[in-house]
From Swiss-Prot:
Belongs to the enoyl-CoA hydratase/isomerase family. Pathway: Lipid metabolism; fatty acid beta-oxidation. It catalyses: a (3S)-3-hydroxyacyl-CoA = a (2E)-enoyl-CoA + H2O; a 4-saturated-(3S)-3-hydroxyacyl-CoA = a (3E)-enoyl-CoA + H2O. It comes from Arabidopsis thaliana (Mouse-ear cress). Substrate binds at S68, G69, V70, D71, L72, A112. It comes from the Eukaryota. GO terms for biological process: fatty acid beta-oxidation. GO terms for cellular component: peroxisome. This is Probable enoyl-CoA hydratase 1, peroxisomal. A motif (Microbody targeting signal) lies at residues 263-265. GO terms for molecular function: enoyl-CoA hydratase activity. Straight-chain enoyl-CoA thioesters from C4 up to at least C16 are processed, although with decreasing catalytic rate.
Amino acid sequence: MDQTVSENLIQVKKESGGIAVITINRPKSLNSLTRAMMVDLAKAFKDMDSDESVQVVIFTGSGRSFCSGVDLTAAESVFKGDVKDPETDPVVQMERLRKPIIGAINGFAITAGFELALACDILVASRGAKFMDTHARFGIFPSWGLSQKLSRIIGANKAREVSLTSMPLTADVAGKLGFVNHVVEEGEALKKAREIAEAIIKNEQGMVLRIKSVINDGLKLDLGHALTLEKERAHAYYSGMTKEQFRKMQEFIAGRGSKKPSSKL
């Protein structure tokens, strides 16, 4: 049975089947973030990590925007004080979450919203979605990773253009650049995100967590060290398995092999 919890303007809905949906719910302000919302968002992602009923998290925004950035009417409270605390930093908590995060992006993902999208593992965007970096326009120094992550995904030259001009990156262009996984028609982003989540949930969940971890950790290294990391973790994994675990793995593989392949993503 679906369960919905509302933490101020951050909604957490746990659905049957292992999917949780986190929604920024401030549509009249295009889901701009206050300091309190950031704290609640960080807590929501942190809670998902320890919740054994949740296997995949879908992250979205209500109304016609994913997130239009920080509420600049309360800029000082956002950028000063305990903003550096990792426990209340939503991007830090997203990066710490071991489970896959699928972003379902509708409308605007501006500056902080862009950075929240970058913290997702997989992105689905409606055709009208726009990603925009306005740090340079408003004199705000990036601190949630946009200046470093975007160039590693779409290339340095394109990232410089996006950040220095503050011009929007459309969903179609983002898809061609490999930043967005799937571009769908308006109103279809959540549906597609659920399809991807269901495909992930069909797999062996312990290995899903390990593969996400080794991919993300490997991205921080050069290729040679990343390949070494993979071998080390594979060796540790197989060396630590008991005969009973190997038997269960073989049973799982045999059971999966008897099923028809899933439809193409």
